Structures are given as C-alpha cells and as structure tokens.
C-alpha cells in the first residue's frame, strides 16, 4: 500500500514520463494576483499562461500544489474537523497542457495513471465518470477510446440555473477562458451511503470525486457568446488526500497516514485517549495550513491574510484547550509535520525555527485571554433564549478577548446555538472593515490593458532609443491618436523605460518627435507590453508613429542608488537578525527606499547601528555589481534570494554584489556599490504583527538628511544653553529636576487630599448601617480622588464612596467599596452605572473602580442614579 508521499511522487513521475515539466508548488501567497487571498488551485500559478499574458519554455506541466481554503470566497474553515474531506490546507495534483494535447490524451493519461498496475492499479469497475451533457467528444473518448461502459458514464447538464452553469462546466470568471470538464469518481462500496453524481443522494460519501479534468476550449465574451480558443488547453486537479484515502482503503481523509501520525502526536501532547475526537482532526488539519502559511511569509495580524492565519491558529488552540492542553502545544507539531510531508516539507524545514517561534508567541498571546473569554461565553450561553447568542456578546468576545467570530460559532455549534450575526455586524462598525480587509482581493482580472505583441526593453544598456507607437489608451479606451493636453498610456515596440517592478518605481522622461512632446510620469507593465503614462504637451501622437524615447537619467540614477542599497540592506538584515528575515514589501524611489520584512521582535538600537555600518562597509568596498542571466534552478542553487510578490520565469536575471548579496532582480542598479556614496537609516517601526519597516536614504539625500539633523541638534543645544556634546547630560538633568518637582507636587496634593478627606467624612450619610458618600468634588485629579477614597474607607469602616470631578470637558468618576460589602455592591458595576449617565464607561476591582465620561452637564444625573441605586440595594 502506497504512502501519501509515494502517491505524490508517483503522480509527478508518471506525467514526467509523458513529457511534462515538473514545476515546484508556488507560494500560498499568490504572485501578482490581487483577485486571490490564497493559492487555492493548481492552475493559479499558470493563470497568465492560460490568459495569454505569459509564456513558458514548456507546453506540458505537472505540479503538486499546496492550497489553502479559509477566508474569502473559498472558505472551508467552519466544516474542518466535522466532515471527512474538508481541510484548510490540501495538496492538488495537476497536469496541464498549454495548447499542446487536448481531450483524448488528457483522458487517457488519467485512466492509465489510475488503473495501470504499474501506477495506482485501481479496479476499473470501481470508477465512474461524468461529462458535460453536450460534450459528445469526451463521452466518445471515454466509451470507445478507453472502454468505460455506458452505465459508468453520466452526462451532467446545466444544473445550476443558467446556461453553462453546471458542475461539469468550468469558467475562470464571467468572461474569459472556459469549457466543459469531465470528473472521475471512485465507488467506496455499498456499505457507504450515497448515490451517483446527479442523483438525489449524490452528497453522500459512497461516490467520491477524485479527479477533475477541465477542457479550456472557449472564450466567453461579455454578451455571453462563446468563441473557440485558437489553442485549447487542459487544466486538471486531483486532491492528494482524497486519492490517498482511496489507495489506503479508508473512507475519511483523516484516516490516511499523514493525518494519523499528526493526530497521534496531538493526542500525546494533550493527553486525549479517544483518537476519534473531532478536536484532534481540527488541530491536525490546522497545523498544516498555519505552518505553510508562515513559511510562505504570512504573519499573524488583524487584517487580510494575517487575520485568516490568526483565526486558524486560535481555532486550533481552542480545540487544544477542549482536549485538556495545559501548556503551549501547537508549535510542537511542526517537527512531526515536516517528517510526514516528506519532500513536500522542505520549505517548512528551511524556516522551522521561525515557524515554531511565531506559533508559540501567538498561542501564548491568545492563552492570556482564552479562559476568561470562554468563561464569559459559557455564562452567556447558559442564559441564551430561543437558541440565539446575541451579536453584542459575540462582538465583546472578538473585541476584548480576541475571539474570531468563527471560533465563537464553533463553541455555539457544539451546543446547537447560533449567533445573531446581523447584531455582530452592527457592533463591528469600523473594526469590521479592518477584520474583513480580505474583501480588497476582488479586482476584476480582465480589466487590464490587453495588447497583441510585446515591448522589447533596452533600458539595461540604453537611456534613449527610437521606437514605434503600437497602441494608445485614453480614458481607458484604445484610440488611434491623442492631442495636446490629453493624458494617456502609450505602448511602444521598444523602450529604454523601466516599468515598475520589484518595488522599483517606473522611469520618467519624455517621448519626442518633430513638433511633438509627451511627458512620461510613470511606466507600468501590462502583460508583455510597457505602458508609458503621462500627458501630451505639444502636437499630436498617433499609433504607428516613430518617436524617440528619452529617460530622465537623473531620476533613474537616484532610483538605482536606492535599489542597490536595498539589496545591501536585505543582506545586512539577514546577517544581523537571522535568516528568518524575508522581504514583505518594498518601495524604491528616487528620494527614499522602504523595506518591509518579517521580524517577530523589535530591533534594538545597537542592531540598527550594526546593520547601517555593515551596509556602508560594503559601499566603501566598492564591489562590482555583476548581473547574469541563468536558469532559475541554477540561480537558487547559488543562493540567490527571490523577492516577495514577484513572479519569475524559467530564466532569471541575477544581481550580485561581491560575496555579500545575491538576488533575483530585474531592476536598474549601479555599476559599483561605491556609487551609492552613503546609506543612512532614517526610520524603523512596526507596521503589523511580526513585520518591521526600515526607511533609508542614500547619496546626496543622505548627506542632506545628516545636515538637517546637525542643524536640529545645534538649535536644541542653543535653546538649552548647552553645547552639542553635553546635550544628553543637560536633558537628563532637566528630566531629573522635573521628576523631583512632580513628586513634590504630588505629595502636596495627597496631603491636601487627606485633609479634604477628613472634612468630607463628616458629610457621610448612613443607609442600613453603611456609611455612604456620593459627591462632586472640584479641582481634583484622579490620583487625589483615589487617595481620598482609600482614606475614607479606613476612617468609616463599612462604607461606599463615589466621587465625580470635572476637568475641562471631561468627567472622572471613582468608586470605592469596603471589602465587607463587595458581595452585594461591586465598585465596577456601580461606576459603570454612573458612567453611562455621562457618556462613558469604565471598570476595575470590586473594591475600587474608575471611569471617564464626556458629558459634564449630566453629572447631577449620575449622582442621583448612584444614590437611588444605593438606597435600593443596601
């Protein structure tokens, strides 16, 4: 019986033997595709190839693609652990044809791999296939070409309420490539409930889809017309976990070898004896998605991809709590995961220390609020009426205790209670927009400039070339000419202009001809062509016209200084902080460089100095900057670093600076590092959980910055009547003096407050043997109020004291209760009751609590409400 790792390798070996290029799994973070939150299918990395926007050196490919479906449109999170086949992370085995073979070979390849004794050897009688109702060609290949009996072939029509809306018709979107598909199902046997595809019992588990083969043969236009594609293609997908369950003779994906080893480890860590417990499944699934997402550069945070990761981690931790985990456990699964994933675990293994560290930190952070949040939820669930938990409680759990809504829903589901999601949404307001930041991943991919042909880039060696205008776009539409004053996008057949990529902004300059000038403000790449964005200053510009394209060399030179310095900075960060540092984003302009990178902890000042010194050391070394073009595998073998969010072809450009830095990069660089002159870090900050940002300047800009800082230093010294060398000592003296004065002032305030307390004690009234003081005090700060409250509690014995004071437009409230009364009068509840009257809220201990408000005009109302409550409850 084959292991999952052996099945994965067999699939790749089979298609390699059929002339397919084995392509590594792409990152779970889609490259340059804003329409996707996570990679969720094998075809994602080939999307531009299918759309005709990219070319590869091969026409046949095969992959074992890592996928995540959690968050966004494809969200399996709530079902994970409760069904046999839902996962947040899975592997999709796929074979692809880019205008090469089509239906006949695709079908025969699939059948051979599944049934041949040399490969998987499945019994033919256990397999059923579906085809699109009108796809007679596929039906004929299955029946006559392969020999599948007619009673094992099922035609599926438009079963989703519209033309071409079918389980057996695939489309990339409302427009674009689409076509019929054929699916292969495995029959688990009569002992499992379920019916054939298309029957009323099709949702059962007897007949399970294992392979989907899509025939991309049409291009759907906006009016619904189907045009035949000139080069039909094939896109297939087979879930590795599903086919492993078939081969290993089990009906649930969670019973295959990978999951059984993970489940056993979870049980060991938590002490759980029942290996069928669904919480074990949840955790075993979630460690896969979490570890691979972190390895691919996602950091837990409160927005976008990072928030989805945080939700998955917290769901796993909550299920660990259910199993009885007393300590951090989740990160301890990483070594087992690496082992069971075999060769597919190499990416996690390379970043194992960082993956484990981030998982541990996230679990520790959530553990601080988990038990208190669960206690609040348990109390709320006891009081639930009509089987619905209020949105207000769900929001409080989210806002105060860090419970994602689906985690709360998970707990409610176990008790057959649903959440008032509309109420939750109302409470979310602005915070909902942040937590749902994934919604920004919704750009229509078809809304791009599509132009036949390519633009040849001459900019590595030239700053000026002669070129022909191949297309013009004005106000989003293709036009034949533009006039002076109009802003447009100009497409050229050749260009020296660098198009924005890899964080480097696009070149500026001008396009000129006799009596014509077009000022280029930016350059962008659209598929295989370069768009020169700007305004026509003089004359007219026509498609087909020959012009001179001239780059602004001063702008480019300043930009190249910053780009080369960014490479040196990246290398220095990895040397000083560790190899876990990975680029998360960058901006390289003519004025500044900005570099965002994974770093779970704050950077110490001495580390920043070391990084800066290291960069300047390699600038002074005046390394030759060498660029080479080579196969991507060779580049990676040499240690070249790839940049986050960039897409690379089979052949790449490598930029090397001495032995210090080597990266894949298509950008413009200096010839020697000495040209950078000077590198100065001007800012370092956190921009998200686990992500830091460094901003720096170079060359003349760095000198200007240092001169400005020197001027500020001298002005500050003059103001403090000191010299620059003694400035720190002078400031320290002033701070010490200010602290001493503040301490003396506070002592005077407390002394005054103690005296005031003695006077106030005389105004206490008695309610059923309890001394009560409810007053507004003037000219008192919060610290003084607390001193008075503590003093009065000591003086009066059994007492409740409530004070209100006004400072400008703000209200401060302090309530104190002697410990003998806290069972029936809680300071936190009473201060909140008062705060509600003045537009505020607060809290604290049962014996001492504070609150603030913004409506001083309602102070008398707050005092009245407090008095009434005390008369009623004492």
UniProtKB/Swiss-Prot annotation:
Organism superkingdom:
Bacteria
Its Enzyme Commission number(s) read 6.1.1.7
Q: Name one GO molecular function term.
A: alanine-tRNA ligase activity
| Cofactor, how bound (note) | Binds 1 zinc ion per subunit.
Q: Which residues bind Zn(2+)?
A: 563, 567, 665, 669
Keyword check for tRNA-binding? yes
Please provide one cellular component term from the Gene Ontology annotations of this protein: cytosol
Keywords recorded for this protein, A-Z: Aminoacyl-tRNA synthetase, ATP-binding, Cytoplasm, Ligase, Metal-binding, Nucleotide-binding, Protein biosynthesis, RNA-binding, tRNA-binding, Zinc
* Notes concerning its domains: Consists of three domains; the N-terminal catalytic domain, the editing domain and the C-terminal C-Ala domain. The editing domain removes incorrectly charged amino acids, while the C-Ala domain, along with tRNA(Ala), serves as a bridge to cooperatively bring together the editing and aminoacylation centers thus stimulating deacylation of misacylated tRNAs.
Q: What is the protein name stated in its UniProt record? A: Alanine--tRNA ligase
Species assigned in the record: Histophilus somni (strain 129Pt)
Q: Which gene encodes it?
A: alaS
């Amino acid at each position: 019986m084959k292991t999952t790792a052996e099945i994965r390798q067999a699939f790749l070996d089979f298609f390699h033997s059929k002339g397919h290029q084995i392509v590594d799994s792409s990152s779970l973070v889609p490259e340059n595709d804003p329409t996707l939150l996570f990679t969720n299918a094998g075809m994602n990395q080939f999307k531009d190839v299918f759309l005709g926007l990219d070319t590869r050196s091969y026409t046949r490919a095969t992959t074992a693609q890592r996928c995540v479906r959690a968050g966004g449109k494809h969200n399996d999170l709530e079902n994970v652990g409760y069904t046999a086949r839902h996962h947040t992370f899975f592997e999709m085995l796929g074979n692809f044809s880019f205008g090469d073979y089509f239906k006949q070979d695709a079908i025969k390849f699939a059948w051979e791999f599944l049934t041949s004794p040399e490969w998987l050897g499945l019994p033919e009688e256990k397999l059923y296939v579906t085809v699109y109702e009108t796809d007679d060609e596929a039906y004929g290949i299955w029946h006559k070409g392969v020999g599948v009996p007619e009673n094992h072939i099922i035609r599926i029509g438009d079963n989703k309420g519209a033309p071409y809306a079918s389980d057996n018709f695939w489309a990339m979107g409302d427009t674009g490539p689409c076509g019929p598909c054929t699916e292969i199902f495995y029959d688990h046997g009569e002992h499992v409930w379920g019916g054939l595809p298309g029957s009323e019992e099709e949702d059962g588990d007897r007949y399970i889809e294992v392979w989907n083969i899509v025939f991309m043969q049409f291009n759907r236009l906006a009016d619904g017309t189907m045009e035949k594609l000139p080069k039909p293609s094939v896109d297939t997908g087979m879930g590795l976990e599903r086919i492993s369950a078939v081969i290993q003779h089990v009906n649930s994906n969670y019973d295959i070898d990978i999951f059984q080893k993970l489940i056993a480890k979870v049980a060991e860590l938590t002490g759980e004896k029942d290996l069928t417990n669904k919480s074990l499944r949840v955790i075993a699934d979630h460690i896969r998605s979490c570890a691979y997402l972190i390895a691919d550069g996602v950091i837990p945070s409160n927005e976008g991809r990072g928030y989805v990761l945080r939700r998955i981690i917290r769901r796993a931790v909550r299920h660990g709590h259910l199993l009885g985990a007393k300590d951090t456990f989740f990160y301890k699964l990483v070594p087992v995961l690496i082992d069971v994933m075999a060769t597919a675990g190499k990416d996690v293994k390379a970043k194992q220390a960082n993956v484990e560290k981030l998982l541990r930190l996230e679990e520790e952070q959530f553990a601080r609020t988990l038990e208190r949040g669960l206690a609040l939820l348990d109390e709320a669930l006891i009081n639930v009426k009509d089987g619905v938990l209020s949105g207000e409680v769900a929001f409080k759990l989210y806002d105060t205790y860090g419970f994602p809504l689906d985690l709360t829903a998970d707990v409610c589901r176990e008790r057959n209670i649903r959440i008032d999601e509309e109420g939750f949404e109302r409470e979310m307001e602005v915070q909902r927009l942040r937590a749902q930041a994934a919604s920004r991943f919704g750009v229509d991919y078809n809304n791009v400039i599509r132009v036949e042909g390519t633009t040849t880039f001459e900019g590595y060696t030239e700053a000026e070339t002669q070129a022909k205008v191949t297309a013009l776009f004005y106000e989003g539409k293709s036009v034949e000419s533009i006039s002076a004053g109009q802003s447009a996008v100009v497409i050229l057949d050749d260009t020296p202009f660098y198009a924005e990529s890899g964080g480097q902004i696009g070149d500026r300059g001008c396009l000129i001809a006799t009596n014509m000038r077009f000022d280029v403000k930016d350059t962008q790449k659209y598929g295989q062509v370069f768009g020169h964005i700007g305004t026509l200053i003089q004359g007219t510009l026509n498609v087909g016209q020959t012009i001179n394209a001239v780059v602004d060399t001063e702008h480019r030179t300043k930009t190249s200084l910053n780009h080369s310095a960014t490479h040196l900075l990246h290398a220095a960060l990895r040397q000083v902080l560790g190899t876990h540092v990975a680029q998360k984003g960058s901006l390289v302009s003519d004025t500044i460089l900005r570099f965002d990178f994974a770093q779970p902890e704050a950077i110490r000042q001495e580390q920043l100095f070391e990084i800066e010194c290291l960069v300047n050391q390699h600038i002074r070394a005046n390394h030759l900057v060498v660029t080479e073009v080579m196969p991507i595998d060779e580049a990676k073998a040499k240690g070249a670093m790839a940049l986050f969010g960039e897409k690379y072809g089979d052949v790449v450009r490598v930029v090397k600076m001495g032995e210090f830095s080597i990266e894949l990069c298509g950008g413009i660089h200096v010839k020697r590092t000495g040209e950078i002159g000077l590198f100065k870090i001007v800012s370092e900050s956190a921009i998200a959980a686990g992500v830091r940002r460094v901003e720096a300047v170079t060359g003349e800009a760095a000198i200007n910055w240092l001169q400005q800082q020197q001027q500020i230093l001298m002005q500050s010294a003059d103001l403090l009547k000191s010299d620059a060398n003694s400035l720190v000592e002078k400031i320290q003296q002033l701070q010490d003096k200010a602290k001493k004065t503040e301490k003396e002032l506070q002592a005077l305030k407390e002394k005054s407050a103690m005296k005031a307390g003695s006077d106030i004690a005389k105004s206490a009234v008695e309610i059923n043997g309890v001394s009560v003081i409810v007053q507004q005090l003037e000219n008192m700060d919060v610290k003084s109020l607390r001193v008075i409250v503590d003093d009065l509690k000591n003086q009066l014995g059994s007492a409740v004291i409530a004070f209100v004071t006004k400072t400008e437009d703000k209200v401060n409230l302090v309530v104190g209760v002697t410990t003998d009364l806290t069972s029936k009068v809680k300071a936190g509840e009473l201060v909140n009751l008062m705060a509600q009257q003045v537009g505020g809220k607060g809290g604290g201990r049962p014996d001492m609590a504070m609150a603030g408000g913004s409506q001083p005009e309602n102070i008398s109302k707050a005092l009245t409400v407090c008095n009434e409550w005390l008369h009623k409850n004492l």
